């Protein structure tokens, strides 16, 4: 399958966030079927993360999970492994606690196709208050 976007997520003991993260990807107006999600787990020790990743891998053909044997302690290790596997036209590095508005990927995809480079911004949410990044 040729995906428009590959989303690479390095995880470690992040089970509490994974459903919400994947829900925000599934709701993308670009179309979930055009998005590849690659989770690379950095040897999590909690069963919640491992169970969810195995479930996602079975349930969705465009979601894969890779499990590292040893904890590297560095998200770049998982991201680099994900890059080796990514088949999308473009790549997004995401964190397990990220959440995206419904048109985020569509806007980014359209903009990158209109320009040579795309640099995006983000907002941080703490205690239900949005803190804009400057």
PLM features per residue range, with description:
Residues 1-134:
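Nucleotide-sugar donor-binding/catalytic module of glycosyltransferases
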